[in-house]
Structures are given as C-alpha cells and as structure tokens.
Amino acid sequence: DAGADMASVSMHKSGGSLTQSSLLLTGKNVNWEYVSQIINLTQTTSASYLLMSSLDISRRNLALRGRESFRKVAEMAEYARAEINDIGGYYAYGKDMVNGGSVYDFDVTKLSVYTRGIGLAGIEVYDLLRDEYDIQIELGDIANILAYISIGDRIQDIERLVGALADVKRLYSKDPAQMLNTEYILSLIHISEPTRHAQI
C-alpha cells in the first residue's frame, strides 16, 4: 500500500487482459459509489462485457499465480538489463538509480534504455525497432526507449529485443558528439495572433 487514494492499473499492459482494459483502484478513504457516479456521467453505462470478462480472467490469474508470474517478469527484465548493458553504448536503467531522495523506487518491469551513447535518439531506435525488426515497444523520446515487460513475454522475446538492439548499434550508430545537447526542442513557430482573435 503506497498510500494513494486512487490508482489506475493498465491491466492490458501488465496483467494480460485485452487492449483498452484497465482497473481503477480506490483506497479506503474514497467513496467508490461516488466515483462510480462520476464515471457514469462521462462514460457509457453500457460497458464492454468482452473487456470486463478479460479483466476478470486476468484478475483471477494474478490472484492465483501473480507472485510467480511477476517473479519471472522481474528475472527476465534483469536479464535484459544485463545483456543490453553488455552491448555497450546503451544504458539500461536499474535499481542502482534509487537514492532515497530524487529516486525513491524503481519498477523493474519497465525496461528503460538510454540510447544517446550510440548516437541515436530514443525515437530513432523506437522507429527502427518497429519498422525494421517488427518489435513494438512502449515509447521513444529524445534520449531513451521504454519497453514494458509483462506476464505475456517469454525469454525468446527478450533475446529478440536484445539482438535487435545490438543490430541497431552495429548498423545505424553515429557519433554521439554530433547530437543536440538539449532535452527540449524550442518551437520554431511564431504565432502572430492568439487563436481566439484569428479570423477564419
């Protein structure tokens, strides 16, 4: 219990339910009937029984085998981190970042990898993995990629990802010194008139 009043859990990412299904968990200090009323005001009252059934099956599976399943997920993620760091040029973030101050804890199921060491932005590696290797990961930004390891993954999937990252480094790496050294890209668009005053 982390003390949150409410938390959303993407069961379709972590628990094996169908895409678009997630759970909203409420703590003991939250009136769940009131939350349900608010949700019914903004969403359909005719929920998808297919999605709800998949959530229930996933919930049952996690209740019966969740600890064992996530132990395997954690082992696969740690294996992936070690293998990716052995490639060189990449850095797979790990529990070594936890310092009790700015980083309190670390979710081992999220495989976050720094890519600028091979001279490529995370979004470039993301695109290469998707387009050239048929591997869809969670996201890529200016410096990192994020892959989500879940109970549906197998060790073969991890090895395929590690092999693809080694291949990307071998075939597409550039000189990291040539990369922009900023976290944010400034907007090049100048808006001459606020939208509310613009005439159509």
Kindly label every feature range from the protein language model:
Residues 13-14, 28-31, 57, 116-118, ...:
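Short, glycine-/Ser/Thr-/acidic-enriched flexible segments
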Residues 189-200:
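Residue-level detector of conserved catalytic or cofactor/ligand-binding positions
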Residues 54-68, 152, 156:
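Amphipathic alpha-helix from the class-I
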Residues 2-35, 43-52:
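Active-site PLP attachment segment
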Residues 68-151, 169-187:
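Conserved small-domain helix->loop->beta segment predominantly found in fold-type I
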Residues 2, 14-18, 62, 103-105, ...:
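Solvent-exposed alpha-helices and their adjacent loops that cap or buttress functional pockets
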Residues 156-166:
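Charge-rich, low-aromatic oligomerization/scaffolding segments with amphipathic character
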